[in-house]
């Protein structure tokens, strides 16, 4: 059965986060700032990276041959304790984007930053819509996203939106069993995760990152 929805929202100017200045000598790096919600305190950064980010990072390396840095940041009042349950998912994303932008402006710009993404990790779904649950939300080609740990594919799905991947170009593959690529909007319980993007979305991501260099 279909178990989840992953909406992508159009990027608005008021929620755009600017990437830091890159010097000519710096190595361009894609930086993912990961903010585990305070409710995830029992999960270590190492465990989160192993379970939810390693295969995704391998996929990005394959697509773009680009250094990827994941920076876990915890216990930031106003960010990692934000209320995300019981409100509209798009409203939660707007709140998160504003909070992340405020925080980012207070931080020094890391040398070599190519692009920065800001991801809030949550334990639970964001919203129920009838028989469906919304487990993640992101601005398309934006910098802000929220992903629940309810599915191992949600992190890759939402970060994919920020890198220009789309639902329409997701597909079903076969790796010993039928599997869904990262960008499937509604997961079907009998299919596994491919832990990769479709060829079309790989091309979208590669072109997006190429334009930033």
Regions found by a protein language model. Name each.
Residues 7-18:
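Bacterial N-terminal signal peptides
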Residues 31-34, 117-121, 146, 162:
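Structural recognition of the beta-strand scaffold that forms the well-ordered cores
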Residues 37-41, 76-79, 123-128, 152, ...:
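Solvent-exposed loop/turn segments at secondary-structure junctions
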Residues 138-213:
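The catalytic-center signature of Zn2+-dependent metalloproteases
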Residues 21-110:
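Propeptide-to-catalytic entry region of secreted or membrane-anchored zinc metalloproteases
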Residues 44-51, 133-135, 194-197:
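Short, polar loop/linker segments at the starts of domains and inter-domain junctions
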Residues 1-5:
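Positively charged n-region of N-terminal signal peptides that target proteins for export
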Residues 100-113, 122-140:
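Catalytic zinc-binding patch centered on the HExxH motif and its immediate surroundings
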């Amino acid at each position: 059965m279909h178990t989840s929805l992953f909406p992508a929202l159009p990027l608005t100017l008021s929620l755009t986060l600017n990437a830091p200045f890159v010097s000519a000598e710096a190595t361009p790096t894609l930086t993912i700032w990961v903010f585990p919600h305070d409710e995830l305190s029992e999960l270590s950064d190492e465990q989160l990276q192993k379970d939810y980010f390693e295969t995704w990072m391998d996929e990005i390396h394959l697509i773009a041959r680009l250094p990827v840095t994941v920076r876990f940041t915890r216990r930031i009042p106003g960010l990692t304790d934000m209320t995300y349950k019981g409100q509209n998912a798009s409203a939660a994303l707007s709140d998160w984007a504003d909070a992340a932008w405020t925080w980012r402006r207070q931080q020094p710009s890391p040398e070599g930053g190519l692009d920065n993404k800001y991801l809030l990790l949550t334990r639970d779904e964001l919203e129920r819509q009838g028989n469906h649950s919304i487990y993640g939300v992101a601005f398309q080609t934006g910098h802000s996203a929220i992903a629940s740990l309810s599915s191992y594919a949600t992190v890759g799905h939402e970060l994919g939106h920020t890198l220009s991947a789309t639902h329409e170009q997701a597909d079903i593959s076969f790796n010993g069993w039928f599997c869904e690529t990262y960008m499937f909007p509604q997961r079907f319980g009998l299919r596994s995760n491919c832990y990769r993007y479709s060829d079309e979305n790989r091309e979208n991501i590669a072109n997006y990152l190429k334009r930033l260099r």
